[in-house]
């Protein structure tokens, strides 16, 4: 079958296929209405999670229309849809092939622990296998005879072939006097479940070798601040490495190319490096590759590390095998001047699925075939957005002379001169923005605003930039944003009298801080799931998370004592008197990362002080804006608020 036909089949599904009950935007009276860019970008992606089977013969993907979602499978050389399944009213997080005939889907829900267990509301993951051949769905149930367990997954699945059977390995929870981590296995086709290993330490991870045995176990003791790696020797788990770390703990991430060493990821001088640890004698080898890595790429069947990525904004892929690197270089040549990200690949690396973003192909999924050296666009991620707004790399000097890199999205068809501006700081704060496609700045640009996304100090672009953020929460991390406004105004790119700040999570905090701690820059603010009271947030974190999590936050906030007055110094709620512009707060009722009360108390305090404030509650929404309806609700409320207080035209 020609690759063009494959693309047209996917396009037909995206436009509305009468399969699986006819998931389509079309109503009973005719064709689907024409949607605005805001409506398109506020919805979940039309096409996502495009993955190729290990043998390279089948494609699976998720198609969305409104809140209706379905997983489809099509096969090379055959017409129509091989099979498909509707996704129920749940949050589908990911799909992946576990062998040539079975897909593993990860779903989540926000809830309290099961009856009889104590703990806060959290996002619980569960896994479901979709048997493509039999068209049946099998939930992975962690039910062990004579052992109480919770039916949740606590990490990513690993898949191995053992005695010609597919075995899925998933970390989960078992119960003694409390819930504790364990490693479970599920053997197909009967889904027989076993509890392979138990741990009495909450922070535990495992590595599974090619034969399906536990090869290594990592543990971290939070109160003692000690870590240990154990490997299997002569049928027993033996300690081969240990150390201390108060925050930057190591991780075991896979195996070396020959399987003789465990690969551990370490933070050294702020950089992440990969070190091989011999399972034979516990000796450390020279770091893999050159430089530091971001993302690990493993061989599906063995867990051996075959490559990784360098860089944050400009992500570069490195493969340790020359032939694989040649395949990847061919992919890059097929998409010159475009951003290319690896999504999925066949085991022999002959067929590769990528996301591409650029002027020629917009934001799309594509298939590259090594044997034909042909690339085919499979479909747009957001159907109807074929020409996204242009993203420019910019940089400026902060007040203390530090160079800050940022990205400026400019409304399509407008000259970069005297534009209204939205400053959109990222969450984290140890995260980073890039010139990749992002639905939020694209949505704001579609309304006529330029959008500035600075990688302020604390962003994880470089180790030096991360460390520069320690102790600067609400301080230089905040003025790095307004320094960008001043620089663009000096150049004449934006109108300094028409600037607002918008953000979510830490970015939501930055939005509130921008109009309280750094007043006079912004004429309005939109805070989505933002932190308003740092002392209350710190107390909540202490009650609901491990000490290492608290130490992580304290390092950025510059806090060494929970009674430190610095918490009030950088809390927006304690500086409402300085606020003289309107604020919109938006918060998901099911948020388990930043409590909903953080917005409630800020709204109440602002109302009491007579400050202009609006509040939008997103019912049944979590911290990540996971559903299309509430994401659109947030965008529409924000757009109306911005238009009223900082009109673009």
Role assignments for model-derived ranges:
Residues 11-21:
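Bacterial N-terminal signal peptides
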Residues 52, 61, 97, 255, ...:
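Conserved hydrophobic/aromatic "anchor" residues
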Residues 357, 424-428, 588:
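Glycine-rich His-Gly loop
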Residues 2-11:
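Bacterial N-terminal signal peptides that target proteins for export
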Residues 456-649:
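Active-site-proximal cap/loop segments of hydrolase catalytic domains
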Residues 26-352, 359-361:
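Beta-propeller folds
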């Amino acid at each position: 079958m020609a690759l063009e036909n494959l693309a047209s089949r996917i396009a037909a599904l995206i436009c509305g296929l009468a399969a699986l009950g006819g998931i389509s935007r079309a109503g009973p009276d005719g064709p689907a209405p024409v949607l605005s860019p805001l409506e398109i970008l506020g919805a979940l992606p039309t096409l996502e999670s495009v993955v190729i089977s290990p043998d390279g013969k089948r494609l699976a993907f998720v198609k969305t229309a409104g809140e209706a979602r379905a997983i489809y499978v099509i096969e090379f050389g055959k017409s129509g849809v091989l099979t498909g399944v509707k996704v129920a009213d749940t949050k589908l997080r990911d799909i992946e092939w576990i062998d040539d005939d079975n897909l593993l889907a990860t779903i989540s829900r926000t809830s309290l622990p099961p009856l009889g267990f104590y703990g806060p509301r959290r996002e619980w993951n569960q896994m479901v296998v979709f048997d493509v051949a039999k068209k049946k769905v099998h939930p992975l149930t962690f039910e062990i005879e004579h052992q109480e367990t919770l039916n949740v997954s606590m990490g990513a699945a690993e898949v191995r072939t053992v005695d010609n059977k597919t075995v899925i390995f998933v970390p989960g929870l078992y119960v003694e006097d409390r819930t504790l981590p364990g490693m479970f296995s599920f053997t197909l086709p009967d889904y027989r479940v076993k509890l392979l290993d138990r741990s009495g330490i909450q922070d535990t991870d495992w590595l599974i070798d090619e034969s399906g045995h536990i090869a290594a176990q990592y543990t971290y003791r939070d109160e003692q601040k000690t870590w240990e790696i154990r490997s299997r020797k002569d049928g027993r788990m033996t300690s081969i490495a240990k150390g201390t770390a108060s925050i930057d703990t190591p991780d075991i991430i896979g195996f070396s190319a020959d399987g003789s060493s465990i690969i551990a990821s370490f933070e050294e001088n702020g950089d992440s490096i990969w070190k091989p640890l011999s399972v034979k004698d516990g000796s450390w080898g020279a770091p893999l590759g050159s430089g530091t890595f971001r993302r690990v790429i493993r061989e599906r069947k063995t867990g051996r590390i075959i490559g990784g990525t360098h860089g944050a904004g400009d992500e570069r892929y490195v493969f340790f095998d020359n032939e694989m690197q040649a395949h990847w270089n061919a992919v890059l040549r097929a998409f010159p001047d475009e951003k290319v990200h690896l999504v999925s690949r066949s085991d022999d690396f002959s067929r590769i699925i990528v996301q591409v973003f650029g002027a020629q192909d917009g934001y799309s999924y594509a298939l590259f075939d090594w044997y034909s050296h042909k690339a085919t666009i499979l479909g747009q991620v957001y159907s109807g957005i074929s020409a996204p707004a242009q993203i420019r790399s910019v940089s400026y000097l902060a007040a203390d002379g530090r160079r800050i890199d940022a990205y400026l999205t400019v409304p399509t068809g407008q000259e970069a001169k005297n534009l209204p501006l939205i400053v959109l700081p990222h969450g984290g704060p140890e995260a980073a923005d890039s010139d990749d496609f992002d639905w939020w700045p694209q949505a704001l640009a579609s309304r006529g605003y330029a959008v500035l996304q600075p990688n302020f100090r604390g962003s994880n672009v470089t180790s030096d930039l991360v460390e520069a953020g320690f102790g600067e929460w609400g301080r230089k991390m905040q003025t790095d944003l307004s320094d960008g406004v001043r620089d663009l105004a000096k150049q004449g790119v934006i109108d300094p009298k028409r600037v607002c700040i918008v953000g979510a999570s830490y970015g939501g905090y930055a939005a509130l801080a921008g109009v309280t701690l750094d007043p006079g820059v912004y004429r309005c603010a939109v805070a989505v799931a933002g932190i308003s009271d740092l002392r209350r947030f710190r107390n909540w974190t202490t009650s609901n998370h491990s000490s290492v999590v608290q130490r992580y936050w304290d390092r950025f906030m510059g806090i060494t004592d929970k009674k430190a007055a610095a918490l009030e110094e950088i809390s927006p709620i304690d500086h409402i008197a300085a606020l003289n512009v309107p604020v919109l707060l938006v918060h998901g009722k099911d948020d388990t990362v930043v409590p909903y009360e953080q917005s409630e108390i800020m709204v109440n305090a602002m109302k009491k002080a007579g400050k202009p404030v609006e509040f939008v509650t997103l019912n049944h929404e979590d911290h990540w804006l996971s559903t299309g309806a509430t994401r659109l609700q947030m965008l529409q409320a924000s757009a109306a608020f911005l238009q009223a207080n900082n009109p673009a035209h």
